[in-house]
Amino acid sequence: MREKMAEATETQASETSTRGRPKTRVGIVTSNKMQKTVVVTVQRRAPHPKYGKIMSLREKYKAHVEDHDYPKKITINEGDRVRIAETKPASKDKRWRVVEVLEKSKNV
């Protein structure tokens, strides 16, 4: 019995010790009014679990931007299309960082 438990814990430890790639999302910046932070809205389409109808779902993520200082130096504007990646928690609700700006907004 103990041998089986030891084997199980060894396999769990080996599986969790390897890290995969961080999750990435592409979305539109909806707010840039914070220092070093932007709010990114990510839209996705998914079927309803019971009825199967395709729904449009959206989630908002707070993402960290190192060189963005709101009143003085704005590097990312509202409407910009950005790629964000998952990272370690930077604050209470910031767990994403901006990797790159894919497309600048046209109404600057």
From Swiss-Prot:
Region listing for Disordered, in residue ranges: 1-26
Pfam families associated with the record: Ribosomal_S17 (PF00366)
GO terms under biological process: translation
Molecular function GO terms recorded: rRNA binding; structural constituent of ribosome
Residues forming coiled coils: none
One Gene Ontology cellular component annotation held by this UniProt entry: cytosolic small ribosomal subunit
Biased composition (Low complexity): 8-17
Keywords from the named record: Ribonucleoprotein, Ribosomal protein, RNA-binding, rRNA-binding
Record note on quaternary structure: Part of the 30S ribosomal subunit.
Record-stated family: Belongs to the universal ribosomal protein uS17 family.
Reported function: One of the primary rRNA binding proteins, it binds specifically to the 5'-end of 16S ribosomal RNA.
Protein name: Small ribosomal subunit protein uS17
Gene (UniProt): rpsQ
